[in-house]
A protein has these predicted regions:
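Glycine/small-residue-rich loop that forms an oxyanion/phosphate-binding "nest" at active or ligand-binding sites
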Residues: 53-78
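Structured helix-beta-strand junction loops
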Residues: 22, 41, 68, 168-169
Length: 182
C-alpha cells in the first residue's frame, strides 16, 4: 500500500459519519469531476488521493460509492454555514441576488439535486431550515455534482431570512403544496 497509511484509511472511513465530519471540519468528495471542482473552487482542499497511486483495492475500502472512483479528496468545510442571528443572515444575503429558501428537506439526494438545479438556474445562494439534511452528507455532496462549490448554502431560521430580506427591500415569493395558481 503506497501513498496512504492505515491511519488515513481509518480517518477517511470515519468521515462517512456526521460526528467525525463535524469534529474535523472537513468532508469528502469523490470522482474526477468533483475533485477537479473542489480544486478550482475557493474551498481549501486538504489532500487528494488517486486510484493509480493507492490501488483499486484501497480505493474500494475508502469510498462511499458502490464502485471505487478514480479520485477522492478531503475538503475543509466553509465556516459560515450555520447562521443564528439576523445580522449574519443580512450579511449572507448581501446587497442583491436571487436566493432559494428550503423548508426541512430530509432526503440527501433531493437536497443535492436541488443545489445542482439551483446552480444551473443561476441562484446565488440557498437558505435552509436548520433541521434540513446535512449539506456535507456524502449523498448530498455527490448529488450536487460539483454545484456545492458554486452555490452558497446557509442554515438559518426562515423567519430570520424573511425579516432580513424584507428590511433590505427584497421581494419574497413562496410556493405551497396546497396553494392556488396565480
Amino acid at each position: 500500500m503506497s501513498g496512504i497509511s492505515n491511519n488515513e484509511i481509518k480517518y477517511l472511513r470515519s468521515l462517512s459519519q456526521k460526528k467525525f465530519r463535524d469534529e474535523s471540519g472537513v468532508f469528502v468528495v469523490e470522482g474526477e469531476k468533483m475533485v477537479a471542482e473542489a480544486l478550482k473552487s475557493g474551498f481549501e482542499v486538504e489532500k487528494v488521493w488517486r486510484e493509480e497511486e493507492i490501488g483499486t483495492d484501497v480505493m474500494a475500502r475508502i469510498t462511499s460509492l458502490s464502485s471505487p472512483s478514480p479520485a477522492l479528496a478531503v475538503v475543509k468545510k466553509p465556516g459560515n454555514v450555520r447562521l443564528s442571528d439576523g445580522k449574519a443572515v443580512s450579511e449572507a444575503l448581501g446587497l442583491r441576488g436571487l436566493f432559494l429558501a428550503l423548508d426541512t428537506i430530509r432526503d440527501p439526494g433531493n437536497l443535492g439535486t436541488i443545489i445542482r438545479i439551483a446552480d444551473w438556474f443561476g441562484i446565488d445562494g440557498i437558505f435552509a431550515e436548520p433541521d434540513t439534511v446535512e449539506l456535507f452528507n456524502p449523498k448530498v455532496v455527490q448529488a450536487t455534482m460539483g454545484a456545492i462549490f458554486r452555490v452558497r448554502f446557509h442554515y438559518c431560521d426562515l423567519q430570520l431570512l424573511a425579516d432580513a430580506a424584507e428590511s433590505a427591500g427584497g421581494k419574497l415569493f413562496g410556493t405551497f403544496l396546497d396553494g392556488q395558481n396565480i
